[in-house]
Amino acid sequence: MTEIQKLTNNKEIIAYLAEKFPLCFSLEGEAKPLKIGLFQDLAEALANDEKVSKTQLRQALRQYTSNWRYLHGCRAGAVRVDLNGEPAGILEQEHVEHAAAKLAEAKAKVAERRAVEKANNPKANKKRSVYHSGNKSENKKSAGKKFSKPRQVEQIFVNVDLANLQKGDVVRVKAGDKTTKAEILEVVKEGARVELENGLILTVSADRLFA
């Protein structure tokens, strides 16, 4: 008899729910607002499923509905869906405002974290610039030129461990020969959904994510 492999974390459970109920849950793009009382429907639908427990389902749902993708989708006029993707009522204004407040709060925390990081980085950046410069006169001559040498600093970055990534973590994303800072919005299968400093949101593979 094959031993049933139990799911152990929210990421796995959400992926499992998206597989079982693809018209209700999603791993990419904007998430749909869920029907009020969906947990009870979910618990009944998976009552005989040994992979997940009610406690795990509740925790996974809490994480799913606090995700930025979900909060973005909770706007005026949005329609809630049930497990089969069927309409289950229009999102109430009270819940629209609550989602907007939660999203603003989450973004404020990210902005605060970035500010702290920027405050800590200048010293390191100054040290690097000293290593790559000869003297002041040379620096003035090279001020208007493009150098590829400083880009070599990227070589010190190491690939991140997806298992340790969390929403809100700041990483570097490699695009060609360049890297740019990005904020983790969600860890997905074999990669992560990130927001770049310019506001662009995209999904990148693990081999392009660096610490």
UniProtKB/Swiss-Prot annotation:
Q: So which domain of life are we looking at?
A: Bacteria
Q: Which GO terms describe its biological process?
A: post-transcriptional regulation of gene expression
Q: Name one GO molecular function term.
A: RNA strand annealing activity
One family name in Pfam for this protein = ProQ
**What Gene3D superfamilies would the database entry show?**
ProQ/FinO domain
Q: Which InterPro entries match?
A: ProQ (IPR023529), ProQ/FinO (IPR016103), ProQ/FinO_sf (IPR036442), ProQ_C (IPR035236)
Q: Which SUPFAM superfamilies match?
A: FinO-like
Q: List the record's Gene Ontology CC terms alphabetically.
A: cytosol
**Keyword set for this entry?**
Chaperone, Cytoplasm, RNA-binding
Region named Disordered: 113-147
Location in the cell reads: Cytoplasm
Keyword set includes Transcription: no
UniProt function note:
RNA chaperone with significant RNA binding, RNA strand exchange and RNA duplexing activities.
The UniProt entry's sequence similarity note says:
Belongs to the ProQ family.
Instruction: List the PANTHER family hit by this protein, alphabetically.
Output: RNA CHAPERONE PROQ (PTHR38106:SF1)
What is the name listed in the Swiss-Prot or TrEMBL entry for this protein?
A: RNA chaperone ProQ
